[in-house]
Every structure is written in structure tokens, then in C-alpha cells.
Amino acid sequence: MLPDVIFVGPTKCGTTWIDTYLRTREEVVLPSDCKETFFFDKAFDKGVPWYESHFRGQGGTCVEVAPSLFHKPDALANVRAVCPNARIVIMFRDPFERVVSHYFHYRKQGVAQMPVAEMATRHPDMIEASLFHKYSLMWMEAFPGQVSFVSYDLLKSDPVGFCSVICDVTGIPDTVPPADALAGRAVNAASLPRSAALAHVTRRGAELARRMGGHGLVNWLRKTGLKKLAFSGGGDVSAERDAVKHDVLGLTPQLAPDLSAFNATYGKKINGI
């Protein structure tokens, strides 16, 4: 079984929430032992049978939520080769807000506080994953007529309406979500680790386990509370967040032209605007 629908990201655009919601839907088949397989960008050498083994459901709509793929041309080529008929879903978020969230993603993993520009130099994906026009164009060209856009803002303002949009682009019945499907499904909030060293070691260990095929182990450890222990508990981030929101405006030359081009080309195609 291969995906009928792939949410290609980018990261920090509500994809964890989407994966969690879709797992409440019996008619949807997702990877059984992990959220994201990283097959198309990090594990393609393992082969298609290995990838298919993650989808163990009986029938239904097969979906992977894989936000790491959006800004990676090689991953796009791999998706095109293996799943040429898949529906591709791109999540749109204000690129400046997305960079701020991505900054705190690295802070949460134990990276030291630094200016946004320096963080972006060390981690180029902070900017690359916010270039919505550049990479949406690539996906549109590779999958003509198969790409949908969904607004992250709708998730924050109207979760039930957001679920309806997700049902539409996924091709599953749009039913009123039960209360327990939305309870506790808050959008990921920024946090800092109680120990940068512990967060760093935990992240590296998880990456190594995934490379060795230990997705199930990583998923089990998440359920034990290790993720919360390693990546949170470090105090209030509000002051740093305010500074980062101001600092990110320095990236206007890199982000604004692409945003203008995206709005002009795809703005009317976004679900939830």
C-alpha cells in the first residue's frame, strides 16, 4: 500500500495536529509505528517494500504527513517516482511567523539562543522552508492538477472548519469531529528544554534510531513522556519570542519577494482563506 495523499509540509505549519486528527479517522491509513517515515528524503535506499511495510491498514485512504519534504528537490523526485498519482497537500503559513516557529524548534532541541540571522545561516532550512512560491512551483510542475493548498491560519481560528478542509483535500467524508478528536489538540507551542545537553542527546539518539529502522522504539519512547522531559520545562519563552519576532524582520529581503510572488500566483487557491 502506497499513499494516496501526502502532506508535504513545510514544517511548523500544523502537520503534527493534522496527523493526530487523521489518526482518529478509521477510514485513513497512516504509518503504523511513526508519524513520518522520512523515506523520500532520508531513507530512500531502504526501498519501496520497506516503505510500504509502514502502512498496515486494510483498505481506506492511505496518507502520510511528511513535512520535511517540501523544500527538498531530491525528495520531490523520489515522490514523483514512487507515487506519481498521489494528491499533494501544501500547508501555507505566513513565512515570517513560520521562521519564528522554526527558530524555536531548534531552541527546543537544545540549540543556544542567538540572532535569527545567525540561526538561519547555521540552519538554512529555516528560510528555505518559508519560500512558498519557489517550492510550490516545483510541486505544481511535478504534479499538475494534483496539488492542494491549506491555510494554517484556519487551524488557529476554526479547528472544526479546518477539519472539514482536511477531509476535503484527503477525500474522506466530512463529518462533525467528535469532541475527543479535538480535545487537547492545541497547535504546538514554543518551549525550551530544561537541559540543552539532554535535548541534544535525545534528538541525536532519535535520529540514529530512525536511520537504523527503529521508528517503533522512537514512537514508544514518545509515549513514555521522554519527549516532554527532554524538550520542555525550561521556563517562559515570551520575552525571547518578542525579540525574535522583531529580529525576523531583518529577513525581509529574503522572504518578502517570494511571498509576493506566491500570493499573486497561488493566493486564490488556498483552502481556508
What are these regions (language model features)?
Residues 1-273:
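Anion-recognition interface
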